[in-house]
A protein has these predicted regions:
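K/E-rich alpha-helical interaction surfaces of small helical-bundle regulatory domains
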Residues: 17-27
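Vicinal oxygen chelate
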Residues: 2-13, 16, 30-34, 39-46, 59-84, 102-107, ...
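Short beta-turn/strand-loop junction motif enriched in small, turn-promoting residues
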Residues: 27-28, 58
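Short amphipathic alpha-helices in soluble, non-transmembrane regions
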Residues: 23-24, 82-87
Length: 118
């Protein structure tokens, strides 16, 4: 039996700080308020490798580097970095692997790291 990703869960201190950012960043996602602790955003159309993202409200703020992060792809890394900065993300660094692989490390408005590549 194989497992599949049901949803990705991101801890947050304030739903209203991170959810508007992630909804804009991901595009055609809709919000589903589960309760005070959990809010999910999910693609309007399910499938195509776009799992729902659940935000779990936690009392503590982020204090260290994420042990797991999202690797997101767009048509232009440079354009996506600028777009996401305009939405409230922070650019952390650009990384390369060899001559042909590069990505940008970024953080959402609460400091949760993610990467952007082409």
């Amino acid at each position: 039996m194989a497992l599949r990703v049901g949803e990705i869960v991101i801890d947050c201190a304030d739903h209203e700080t991170v959810i508007p950012f992630w909804m804009e960043a991901m595009g055609d996602y809709v919000r589903h308020d589960v309760n005070e602790q959990f809010v999910t955003i999910a693609p309007r159309e399910r499938g195509a490798g776009r799992p729902p993202i659940m935000f779990q409200k936690v009392p503590e703020r982020k204090t260290a580097k994420n042990r797991v992060h999202l690797d997101l792809r767009g048509e232009s890394m440079t354009a996506e970095v600028e777009r996401l900065k305009g939405l409230g993300a922070t650019f952390i660094a650009e990384r390369t692997l060899g001559e042909s692989t590069r990505w940008a490390v970024m953080a959402d408005p609460e400091g949760n790291e993610f990467c952007i590549s082409e």
